[in-house]
């Protein structure tokens, strides 16, 4: 579990989908991150950045990079997902 003064985060696998549980003051929200079949490794927290009323949690799982942006005043969340290109060479 990751904890910030206003936000706590836990990652769970729910019905084959990695899900972030965000607990903010008086309520909780679930944010689906991705399928465990395409993201087999549990996402791990790389960094958290707090600036001007928002908190950004940066996670990674294999080639997946995820940023969860939490607007602290409203509790609104935004998920930005990037999948890095494969480094496999097919040599065709």
UniProtKB/Swiss-Prot annotation:
Residue ranges the record marks as coiled coil: none
- Give the matching InterPro entries: Bunya_NSs
- Entry keyword Nucleotide-binding: no
Q: Does the keyword Nucleotidyltransferase apply?
A: no
Keywords in alphabetical order: Eukaryotic host gene expression shutoff by virus, Eukaryotic host transcription shutoff by virus, Host gene expression shutoff by virus, Host-virus interaction, Inhibition of eukaryotic host transcription initiation by virus
The domain of life is Viruses
Q: Which GO terms describe its biological process?
A: symbiont-mediated suppression of host gene expression; viral process
Pfam assignment, any one: Bunya_NS-S
The entry's function note states: Inhibits host transcriptional machinery, by producing modifications to the phosphorylation state of the C-terminal domain (CTD) of RNA polymerase II. Inhibits phosphorylation at serine 2 in the heptapeptide repeat (YSPTSPS) of the CTD of RNA polymerase II, suggesting that the elongation step of transcription and/or 3'-end processing is prevented. Inhibition of host transcription machinery leads to shut off of host cell protein synthesis and inhibition of the host innate immune response. NSs also seems to be involved in the nuclear relocalization of host PABP1.
Family statement drawn from the similarity comment of this UniProt entry = Belongs to the orthobunyaviruses NS-S protein family.
Q: What is this protein called?
A: Non-structural protein NS-S
Taxonomy of the source species? Viruses, Riboviria, Orthornavirae, Negarnaviricota, Polyploviricotina
């Amino acid at each position: 579990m990751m904890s910030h003064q206003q936000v706590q985060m836990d990652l769970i696998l729910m019905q084959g989908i990695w899900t972030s549980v965000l607990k903010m003051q008086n309520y909780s929200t679930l944010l689906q991150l991705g399928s465990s079949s395409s993201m087999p490794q549990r996402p791990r927290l790389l960094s958290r950045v707090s600036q001007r009323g928002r908190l950004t949690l940066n996670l990674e799982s294999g080639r997946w990079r995820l940023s969860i942006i939490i607007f602290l005043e409203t509790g609104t969340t935004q998920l930005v997902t990037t999948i890095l290109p494969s480094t496999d060479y097919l040599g065709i």
